[in-house]
Amino acid sequence: MKPSERRKARRLAVQAIYSWQLSGNNVADVEHEFLTEQKIDGVDVSYFRELLSGTTTKSAQLDELIMPHLERPFDEVSPIEKAVLRIATYELTFRKDVPYKVAINEAIELAKAFGAEDGHKFVNGILDKIVAKK
């Protein structure tokens, strides 16, 4: 498997989690929508499914790991940054095969692609603190 397949899976997962957060729809429905309506060529679909399922089912646990490092209420964090932080925290916590530097770098790239202008700096700072605490 090429790393780019996982990168594409992460990009799709961020969009799906963002949609789930805003819509409140069932995760299975969000997954189905993304796999049928989005271009999935070159996407590691099983990794996409794991990220979506793992991040959504463990969101409360992930949020508990993220929140102590925030300087503002979690509900004030933009939905896209929340999605990126949740995915990266999932990888840092449950995917020991993913080096922490890779998880953080991928999250920074996702925040640059989808987030606010300096969102990647915010994401980087929070993830660095999470890693330092482990």
Curated annotation (Swiss-Prot):
Coiled coil regions in record: none
InterPro entries named among the record's database cross-references: NusB-like_sf (IPR035926), NusB_fam (IPR011605), NusB_RsmB_TIM44 (IPR006027)
GO cellular component, as recorded: cytosol
Keywords: RNA-binding, Transcription, Transcription antitermination, Transcription regulation
Pfam families: NusB
Superkingdom of origin organism: Bacteria
GO molecular function, one term: RNA binding
Protein's GO biological process: DNA-templated transcription termination; transcription antitermination
Homology family: Belongs to the NusB family.
Main function: Involved in transcription antitermination. Required for transcription of ribosomal RNA (rRNA) genes. Binds specifically to the boxA antiterminator sequence of the ribosomal RNA (rrn) operons.
Protein known as: Transcription antitermination protein NusB
The organism's taxonomic lineage, starting at the top: Bacteria, Pseudomonadati, Pseudomonadota, Gammaproteobacteria, Alteromonadales
Gene from which this protein is expressed: nusB
